[in-house]
Design a protein with these regions (language model features):
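Short strand-turn-strand beta-turns centered on an Asx-Gly dipeptide
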Residues: 154-158
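Localized edge beta-strand/strand-to-loop motifs within extracellular or lumenal beta-rich domains
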Residues: 138-152
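Flexible glycan-contacting loops in extracellular carbohydrate-active proteins
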Residues: 163-191
Length: 213
């Protein structure tokens, strides 16, 4: 699954069960379902109360990084949904801080656009381009890349947006899948795979979409 990347630089989470992802035991909220899809097994979220919490921040400590998710946003979800959230925890209190990485969708006129957000050390950047709309109910790979100076996001290999920002490395924390970390803005759809790489990849290095079967 590493596709030539060293195991020390990339971590892969396959969503083929709900009790663990990427070797990490999950906290299951609601009743997310393992489903069979043309790509293989995936986890489906109902957009109401389904979520998985994972007790790690897979990009903590990375000065540059690439975050990829293969997912399917459904047609009848809420207008704004948070489908993946990496959150930094305060080591003194154990509470969530404002430092975070987020993947979100916005539904506009029956289609969706990608919203990516990154914040660390008081600096932040939002990438949201709803001029680039995509059909709901299909499988996509979305990607956020930070190269040390610029944050970029992609749907497939197509750049959606970019902006300059200076982000210090994220500190340790945890992750939520299917909802924002504060249990708001649930996601309706399915997630097949995520990959977290501790360097900035170019589009030709991005995770390959599996062949439907």
């Amino acid at each position: 699954m590493g596709q030539g990347l060293g195991v020390e630089t990339a971590e892969v989470w396959m969503f083929d069960q709900t009790s663990s992802v990427g070797g990490h035991t999950t906290q299951v909220l609601g009743h997310p379902q393992v489903i069979e899809t043309p790509l293989g097994k995936a986890v489906q979220f109902n957009g109401v109360d389904d979520a998985l919490f994972v007790p790690v921040h897979p990009l903590a400590g990375a000065a540059t990084w690439t975050w990829e998710v293969i997912f399917r946003p459904d047609a009848d979800g809420a207008p704004a949904q948070r489908f993946f959230h990496l959150s930094v925890l305060d080591p003194a209190t154990g509470k969530d801080t404002d430092d975070r990485l987020l993947f979100e969708t916005r539904i506009v006129n029956g289609q969706w656009c990608l919203d990516s957000f990154a914040m660390a050390g008081g600096q932040s950047k939002t990438l949201l381009n709803c001029d680039k709309l995509h059909a709901l109910g299909k499988w996509y790979r979305v990607t956020a890349v930070y190269d040390g100076t610029t944050l970029r996001n992609y749907v497939g290999d197509e750049l959606q947006g970019e902006g300059s920002v200076r982000l210090v490395p994220q500190r340790p924390g945890h992750s939520s899948v299917g909802v924002r970390i504060n249990l708001k803005d649930h996601f309706k759809g399915a997630i097949y795979e995520a990959r977290f790489t501790r360097r900035a990849l170019t589009p030709d290095e991005f995770l390959k979409m599996p062949t439907p079967h």
